[in-house]
Amino acid sequence: MSFDFSTIKWSWVVIGAIVAAVLAFVLTLAVQFGYGLVIGFQLRGTPPQEMLIEAFISTPFIIVGIVITAIGAVIGGRMAARRSEDNPQLAGLVAGVLAAALVLALRAWQWGVVDVWTLASVIVAVLGGWVGGRLAGRRSQTSL
C-alpha cells in the first residue's frame, strides 16, 4: 500500500465517509427506537423514561453501537475504495479516518464527553474503513 494521495478519488472518499457515519447513526437510532417500541408494547403503554435511559447507556447497547459503526465503516470504506483503481486500501483507510472524525463529532455532540467507548468507536471506524478498502482491493485484483 503506497501513500500516494493523488490517486484517490476524493469525492467518493468523502461520500463514503458520510455514508458510513450516517449509516452508523441511523442504524443505532433504529435499534434504540425498536427497543423502546417493544418495551412500550410489553408494558402496554409508555415505558418509564428512566428505564429507557438506563437501558440505552448500558454496556450491551454501547457494544451494539460499536458493531453498527464497524458495519457502516466497512460499507463506506468499500464504497470509496471501489472507485479507486490504483490504491483502494488507502481510499478505504482515508474514508475510515474521515468517518471516525464524524463519529467522534457526533458522539461528543450527543454525550458532551469523550470516553473509552467513543475511543473504541473511532478505532473501529478506522479499522472498518481499512477492511472495506481491502475487500474492494481484493475484489478488483481477482477480477483482472
Annotate each language-model stretch with its function.
Residues 1-144:
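Juxtamembrane/disordered regions of integral membrane proteins
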